[in-house]
Amino acid sequence: MHERSEIARLLRLEGDVRIDFLDSTALAGNPLGDPATRPVVVYLPPGYDADASRRYPALYALHGYTGDAATLVSSRPWETNVLQWTDRLVREERMPPSLVVLVDGFTRLGGSQYVDSIHNGAYATYTVRDVVGHVDANYRTVATEGGRAVLGKSSGGFGAMHLVLEHPGVFAAFASHSGDSYFRYAHFPAFATVHRALEAHDFDLAAFVAAFEAKHKRNMTEYTTMEMLAYTAAYSPRGAHAFDLDLPFDRKTGELRDDVFARWLAFDPAERVAGCQAELSRLRLRYLDCGRRDEYNLDIGARVIARRIRDLGLEVRHEEFDDDHRNVGYRYAISLPALAAVLDHE
């Protein structure tokens, strides 16, 4: 019998939390020099240690841009994080006992989008092979597709959609909370601002990043520019060297580069779903939500995805809220029970 962890006591959980450190071969030697050893945070429901024969489904939670595994563990006043929601829902018998696994997808640029990139490293492979493999090998999971779901918010919501489309057979369900989608509205409006910011550094991307990292405080333009560099590294890397990227606009004039933006759109869930009927058909739950005042227009993206999934003759649960992009953890109270309910239990 394990003694309950300090984190579990700090968060006032009835369940427990374990933190492992995983050496990921998928991330080894990445051009940004980001660590290949990553924390894997695992929530265990109450009673996990009491019955050594029982197995549990696992829900994999993906953080958003600028997040890491610690972000999902952190506690803020008057808010409830994903582990606290899980513990409460299990305690109140609104959700069957399940494991929740927090995946760390942070990079030097602020995030990986959970895709395989020659510039960032193979973050999709790291998630579905290294993290899932580690959890199945070390915890009593239902170690099949039917025993796993993936969820996330913002870039994590994008990651959840990307993984079920790119790696069918790993997860049986997904939930996307305000997930990145319909890039024509979500990302394109920022390109002119980013062009001007990089022009001030003569388009020396390494110099911009170094200046960004050296600051104690960053303004919104700098933050947006770093965010777009992270997306560029995920969607349109040019080579396997740090900052060797194809920007989605012409460096001299700022004109949109249709050839590069087409590479971004190849990752856009709103563009992809129409051609992914087989991948979507095997899922037991497809869940999307967003606030109707989302600052990145992701409510439109969610509507487009929902309609295109329905056009395939498939069901999708699509929720909208009178809300924006921030502080949406309350929606875990909807998605977590819905995901756990469709998974296999032993």
Each model region followed by its residue ranges:
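Non-catalytic cap/lid and distal C-terminal segments of serine-dependent acyl enzymes
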Residues: 1-346
